[in-house]
A protein has these predicted regions:
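Exposed extracellular interaction/assembly regions and N-terminal maturation sites
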Residues: 1-64, 94-104
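Generic detector of low-complexity/intrinsically disordered segments
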Residues: 25, 69-71, 91
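Extracellular jelly-roll beta-sandwich "head" domains, especially the C-terminal globular C1q domain
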Residues: 76-104
Length: 104
């Protein structure tokens, strides 16, 4: 079956249709936003991957919920370096964890 791809979605807010998919960026810097649970109640276990095959960084932002950087525990917007890859997983109704190469 594989992992469906959304190619160069631009500045983008995650939707329910993105569960199990990957966003593939090959051009300019963009921002991917994870919506607040109060705006879009995605299920616990929802996950998506970002592949940044561009020569610039991509931001991964979160609105009012919490985005934890795996292995560190810091919260907030993350930066995915050029040619980096990251996976985000919803772990509670208002918490996500993210990990990957080139992620700060």
């Amino acid at each position: 079956m594989g992992m469906p791809q959304n190619t160069n979605p631009g500045t983008y807010t995650i939707t329910a249709a993105d569960n199990g998919k990957h966003l593939y960026y090959t051009t300019t810097a963009q921002t991917v936003t994870i919506p607040a649970n109060g705006t879009l109640a995605l299920p616990i276990g929802f996950s998506f991957v970002i592949v940044n095959a561009a020569a610039v960084s991509t931001s991964i932002a979160i609105t009012t919920d919490t985005l934890l950087l795996a292995g560190v525990g810091t919260t907030g917007t993350r930066t995915l370096a050029a040619y980096g890859m990251a996976t985000a997983l919803k772990i509670t109704s208002t918490s996500w964890i993210i990990s990957g190469n080139g992620l700060t």
